[in-house]
């Protein structure tokens, strides 16, 4: 299989560095992390630029420009390279031959949906826990962004050679599921014909529990209508959590998301996993019995200094040690969470948690726990996802009374579609808050990134029929040497895709794929639009069949790259639009 230009250049650079090591200019065994090969901001500086000389010079104590000159001299001898220059403190700027860019189109045509794929993950197992919404109701837009970010990140890591486990942690052991069970009990009594008026204060008010109450009434009749809570709480809790998880799975399916594993908090506790984690940590003197400092500020008269099992999280950078049990001996949420990460780490080389930004205050303690539980041998990342503000034509969306004062994810998908939702969730960094405006996300405007990227793909798809109408057949591989400068500029943008994929995977930032696609689509549209004023610039121009075949080959390659990027985002490409 043909190799992408990005992979070839990296291989060339590695060989050149190897030659310098053999020559004694660079010591063997140096850590090459931090070496980059990127497109410079100014095209006048070349097609590619590498910081290799500066990184290696810092490690070896040599002068970066001297090392850059040696690198440049060897890189200049490579077949794909037209010119090499040293700039600034030691950047090596590379200009590639037109033939190299033309060949990249053939690589895209050969690799198809594998173009951009990378082996950098080397088969490492990554556990990504995402969504993990409390099983107390259907999913809403507050859950949506983390779901899409987590799933797109999983796609990205799988595409770059990682083995990925998509995991959902079910918080089914806390007080909120008891409240859920009591809420379902009230709906159960309503289903039996009782008139209870408004939902009691503190219970979940959404109508989504009515079907659960009806199912319970059908199964149990009036057996638990007036029974003491101890008789029915556990039963109603299990039944209602199961019903809510089924709803959540259905909501996720609407987004095109399915998890490989569901882990239950209640099952962890029942299996004694927190006890196992505590014992393991005590053996290493990372849990001790101690008394916490009194709360800062005015201390409640009810506060008492009580000895509790404390995890030494300050040893790992936290601002205080954390209790893993409550005064009554039951587990704190952190205590169970600690055990959960202990279990996850058993069959994964890396752990990633996708959390809502409202959990920012607990990140440090979990990072500390993960470092302790893996003895610092496994990478652990927490990615925080900021809120999504729902608007309609610039005005805040009123909440849904039926859903319990929130807008359900299912309602949003029904209105605008899965692909619009998924794409929009990736148009900003996860750490930045975003607006989702029902009016603008479906606009046929270049200011709408969803439309602009999909429109580029639809235009490319339309070329097949336009070419046929003009009597243009692709036939044998075209003469790509007929592609001019503007066309090769578009090739250069598309050829960045493998590097962008690797960089996005390394940074754990799937939004970079959306950014790349927006840029690629913009350059494609710009080239397309030149044909409006000058018919000779059109992709399908029957008066010059050889050039048209080359341009159509280019367009097909661009369409392939767009599809590959959309696939990583979990978005289906649009093949036809009225404006195409």
What annotation goes with each model-predicted range?
Residues 1-104, 110-580:
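Non-catalytic interaction-recognition regions
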